[in-house]
Structure formats: C-alpha cells, structure tokens
A protein has these predicted regions:
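A detector for small-residue-rich transmembrane helices and their helix-helix packing motifs
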Residues: 1-259
C-alpha cells in the first residue's frame, strides 16, 4: 500500500521541541551541501556532480568502512566506485568513521528524499517525543540511526555505496510509535491522492511489510537501504515495548521526568 501520513489524532502535552529541531537541522544541512547544489560555488554539470560524490565519500556512512573502522584508502578507489572525472578531485582526508552514521543521519540524496523523511518524522515523532521526554527521545533517535547504519553494513559488508538519510532513525521512531499508540487514528493518503483515516497499526504495519518484502526481493539498482529501515524499525519496536511495560507498571502516569 502506497500511503503517506498527514497527521494523527494525538493531542501532545508538550511542544515537540526536539522533533522540530531535528527537522530544521536536516533541512539546513541539506541546503548547504553540494547535494542540493544551491550554492554557486559548486558549479554546474560535471563539477557539481563531482562535488556531490566527493562530499558523500568524505562524510556519509559506508558499510565497508563501518565494519573495518578505517576509511577506504584513495588507491583503492577506481572508476567502478567513483566516476573517472571525479577521481582527480579526491584528496586523502581524515575521516572519523564511527561518527559517519551521525553525519549520514542529516544528509539526504534529493528533495523528495528529505521531504518524505521529514513528513514521517513530523507526524510520528511528536507522539514518541511526548511519551519519552525530550532528552531520551533524542538519545533514542540517534541510537536508531546508528543501529540501522551498522545493521545495513552487516547485510553488505563489502559495500562502498555511501549511506545517507534519516530513514533508519525515523524507522525507529515509527517502530516505537507502533507499540506506543497502535490504535491511534492516522490521516493519510492512499496512492498519494485518496485521503483516508486508518489505525496506526495498519499504516505502519503495511510500511514495515513493504520494507521487508523489498529487502527480500533485493532489487538490483534500487538505491533504497531497506535493511537500514528494517533494523531501525525493530529497534524502535523494542523501545516501544519497554515504554508500554513501564507505563503499565506505573499505572499509566508520566513515564519519565527528563525534558
């Protein structure tokens, strides 16, 4: 089912400050990177494309690097990895590999990529942040991003394609929401056009099934990191389960005092 969320029926008790800040940070980072190519210093055509490629290899999470703990040496990069015209623009740089999943969470490949991610984060992050509190929500979000990145690396240990996007972290938010508020009503669109209100478990459950089936199909040429989505979602479900049990244990009151 091709569905996009628009809003849910949950009245938040506090302003989702962290969710808003995450959205703002993602948008700002996208606008100032070569991927958006809005700054004239990135040039046009081949120069711009090379700036994008070089930028991603310097900052994005790369499976092979994550598992080895070291950046790929320049002499191992060739035309099959980086387009020939761009190789000359690469210089040896110091890359802190363990931080690359953090950087990658704020990088996106296109306008559609970031808009879709931010829409899901806005709709579902508000509820999860309200339940967890600001600090723990941020910690969980970052943890989801790391888990999804390293999970993706385990499925493609020799991969050299840069992994970018907040999708893995947001998948964790979706998984947590599914356990926190499965019967919540979400306003969405079917096939991106037809508005419909449905239970959260229907929309999120179908989303996860779609990611799983796409992962199993392992479509050639598909640039979507389905494994990252699956790992992130499962991590989020575990957190959501803990939240539900904590709420039951303490009578449904305020879950955490952290803000």
């Amino acid at each position: 089912m091709a569905a996009l969320p628009i809003s849910d029926d949950y009245p938040a008790r506090r302003a989702p400050v962290v969710t808003y800040l995450l959205i703002a940070a993602n948008v700002v980072v996208y606008l100032i990177t070569p991927v958006a190519a809005l700054l004239t210093r990135y040039g046009v055509d081949t120069t711009r494309e090379c700036a994008q490629v070089v930028f991603l290899f310097e900052w994005a999470a790369i499976p092979r690097e994550l598992l080895s703990g070291h950046a790929i040496p320049l002499h191992e990069l060739h035309d099959s990895i980086i387009p020939g015209p761009c190789l000359g623009q690469l210089t040896q740089f110091h890359k802190t590999v363990w931080l690359s999943p953090l950087y990658a969470m704020f990088l996106h490949g296109s306008w559609l990529h970031i808009l879709g991610n931010m829409l899901y984060l806005y709709v579902f992050g508000t509820r999860v942040e309200d339940r967890m509190g600001h600090v723990r929500y941020l910690a969980a979000y970052l943890a989801f991003g790391y888990i999804s990145a390293y999970g993706f690396a385990l499925t493609d240990p020799d991969g050299v394609t840069p992994l970018v996007g907040a999708s893995g972290a947001i998948a964790g938010v979706l998984g947590a929401y599914l356990l926190i508020n499965p019967r919540g009503r979400v306003l969405g669109t079917i096939f991106y056009v037809i508005p419909i209100r449905m239970p959260a478990w229907v929309l999120l459950g179908s989303w996860f099934v779609l990611q799983w089936l796409s992962l199993e199909a392992d479509s050639q040429g598909d640039s979507t990191a389905y494994a990252a989505h699956v790992y992130g979602f499962i991590a989020g479900m575990i957190v959501g389960l803990v939240l539900r049990r904590s709420r039951n244990a303490y009578g449904g009151g305020a879950l955490f005092a952290w803000r």
